[in-house]
Amino acid sequence: MKSLSRAALATGAAVFALSMLPATASAQSGGDGDRPSGLIQTETHTQVREIAPAAGAAMTVAATSASKQLNYTQQVQQYDQWCWAADGSSIERSMGGTASQAQFCAAGKGTSAGYCPNQPAQIYEIVRGFRGTGFSAQDAGGPIGFSSVVSQIDAGILNLTGIYWTSGGGHAEVIYGYDSANQSIMVGDPWPTYQRYQTWNYNQYRSNGQFRWNDTIVNIRKG
């Protein structure tokens, strides 16, 4: 049986696009079969983590809020292996930072400010990218529970996720909202031909026929 495309799977998971941005010349995809692969998996995490917001994070809505969506603008990645750099820059700019994709990439890879290779990253390098550009961040060591998504978003914190294709390779996305009524999460994606803003059922995002959520960077804060 032919496997479902990500677009078809997304439709089945109540995924929809709020906007579409044009592809850049250096990050164009050949189609849905050409999967983004800008993330390197170093460990397999099977345990769902429950993570409290970092000390000092301000709760922005009441704990009983049914849904919450943070103000977030998802950039398109400038190179085919820069999903993580696009997400890092997008998160920081949405939270008051100024780092470009190239600057975030250089901080994560430890290269000079004017140069960063088009290479995939490991989670620790993305955490280093945040810390090297004036932010703090924490590796959760796995996917986080829906209640942790709620508490992070309610505290005004965007989360970077690492998903890994069953066919190999990985991709970075960003959680920017939730809806408790149907246990769904709102996800930003930097790949040029994918829907920029999506909504996924939490359990289906955790694991499905095409990918598995394995990593999360949480408690991302400026300063």
Language-model features: where?
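Active-site nucleophile-adjacent alpha helix/oxyanion-hole segment immediately C-terminal to the catalytic cysteine
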Residues: S67-S112
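Acidic-glycine-rich active-site phosphate/pyrophosphate-binding loop
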Residues: G56-S65
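Generic detector of short, well-ordered, non-transmembrane alpha-helical segments enriched
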Residues: L21-A23, Y79, H171
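Conserved active-site-adjacent core of cysteine acyl-enzyme catalytic domains
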Residues: S29-A57, Q103-G223
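Secretory targeting and sorting signals
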Residues: M1-Q28
